[in-house]
Amino acid sequence: MSAKDVKFGVEARDRMLRGVDILANAVKVTLGPKGRNVVLDKSFGAPRITKDGVTVAKEIELDDKFENMGAQMVREVASKSADAAGDGTTTATVLAQAIVREGAKAVAAGMNPMDLKRGIDLAVEAVVADLVKNSKKVTSNDEIAQVGTISANGDSEIGKFLADAMKKVGNEGVITVEEAKSLETELDVVEGMQFDRGYISPYFVTNADKMRVEMDDAYILINEKKLSSLNELLPLLEAVVQTGKPLVIVAEDVEGEALATLVVNRLRGGLKVAAVKAPGFGDRRKAMLQDIAILTGGQAISEDLGIKLENVNLSMLGRAKKVMIDKENTTIVNGAGKKADIEARVAQIKAQIEETTSDYDREKLQERLAKLAGGVAVIRVGGATEVEVKERKDRVDDAMHATRAAVEEGILPGGGVALLRASEQLKGLRTKNEDQKTGVEIVRKALSAPARQIAINAGEDGSVIVGKILEKEQYAYGFDSQTGDYVNMVSKGIIDPTKVVRTAIQNAASVASLLITTEAMVAELPKKNAGGPAMPPGGGMGGMDF
């Protein structure tokens, strides 16, 4: 085990605070509509330009081990806010820096760190209660567009695209963001359920121009196993032919004699049929097939359930108004499933999302939920250069999360105003002793930091702006740094999602309290001879130091 370097008390906190300041100062220049860009060096390719706080925070690694510990803990604030609400990362970082700075001063002055922490916790509870009380539910499409615009640093086009996407796929629908191949940003909406498996054979194609299978009012056979022979299926196929309706087979695979027979029947026109492989793998495949069955009002044919193919009749097949299959995707529109069954399945998936601890599983469950509940919207972000597209895509991602958060918990006046107003509620907060009172005061001062920083980034005097906002009693009164005017923030469309503001202050206070109550820090000592011995001469490469 290598030797360690240990720092205590004031020295430890000072080194840690330096790291906090370096990271927070790099992140906070991006705050607000007049926030600046940060350029990130990449080991290959062009540098990346961004105004996304968490992206900047994730790039920062410091040489000094103790400073780096402070920086990494504040980075955690940004990451946690990004995970919980998808936005508010810069606000959370600014708040954490303000609380740590004031807290470190108080500890150096001899106050009890644990009482300070209790005071901070009391203050945060009161602030969150005030935010929730003043939160306003999102009712119109315009408000969703406004939230998106603010989060995308004032880009109204992004706000409009997001509002359209949410209108089309609903609040549960999935919105994915991709890079476009052109200059224009565009929105593409897929209604119904889509999964990433195409036709097994191009001979199933019905629309040769688009190389696509299009079937109206189709039956859907959902089978968990491979189909190699059609003997078991013959009674069912004959029944389908008599109805005159097309059939889509979803199975693990269709091969050999079974595939050849289906293709021949399709080409002769006796049976309108197409086959696709089942989506997913293992248990996820079973779950997705069950989703398709519920959506289309059919049954997933599985030996686990004791159902054999020869016993399948028409009533066990799913139905859909339209099925479209291209080389890579299958889309089922207007499945014939019962509404109550679909709602029960949606509730079940939501419960699984709440319980899962894996981000990957959560993402996959949310995709399944969207396919059942709404649909899928794809925003393709365009731009003149790769650097511009990447920067814009970052902003669209932020805005997308912010609009979801707004729909979930409502909205508050933006521009740091909601936190400023909440700070007024802390003046009369009762505490058990002076140190706890100081903890409350630390949070009260910190709550003005985001509004102050937004003004500073716009080239204004932060303290003057904060003072003028607090002079007015009106809750939504604030400073529009884009125009330099004092306005009603809500009616001007400068709004923040409640969830974003709430998670920002909670995460900032949580990590800042830990930093304030730190009394010792332990880091590895750098190795004295890190280079290692030189290689012996040989092959013309002697003396090279690895």
Swiss-Prot record:
Keyword Lipid metabolism: no
Enzyme Commission code: 5.6.1.7
A molecular-function term among this protein's GO annotations: ATP binding
GO BP of this protein: protein refolding
Reactions the enzyme catalyzes: ATP + H2O + a folded polypeptide = ADP + phosphate + an unfolded polypeptide
PROSITE patterns, alphabetized: CHAPERONINS_CPN60
Pfam families noted in UniProt: Cpn60_TCP1 (PF00118)
InterPro entries: Chaperonin_Cpn60_CS, Cpn60/GroEL, Cpn60/GroEL/TCP-1, GroEL-like_apical_dom_sf, GROEL-like_equatorial_sf, TCP-1-like_intermed_sf
Keywords from the named record: ATP-binding, Chaperone, Cytoplasm, Isomerase, Nucleotide-binding
Residues holding ATP: 30-33, 51, 87-91, 415, 496
Subcellular location: Cytoplasm
GO CC annotations on file: cytoplasm
Assembly and interaction partners: Forms a cylinder of 14 subunits composed of two heptameric rings stacked back-to-back. Interacts with the co-chaperonin GroES.
Task performed by this protein: Together with its co-chaperonin GroES, plays an essential role in assisting protein folding. The GroEL-GroES system forms a nano-cage that allows encapsulation of the non-native substrate proteins and provides a physical environment optimized to promote and accelerate protein folding.
Family from the record: Belongs to the chaperonin (HSP60) family.
Protein name: Chaperonin GroEL 4
Species for this entry: Bradyrhizobium sp. (strain BTAi1 / ATCC BAA-1182)
Origin organism lineage: Bacteria, Pseudomonadati, Pseudomonadota, Alphaproteobacteria, Hyphomicrobiales
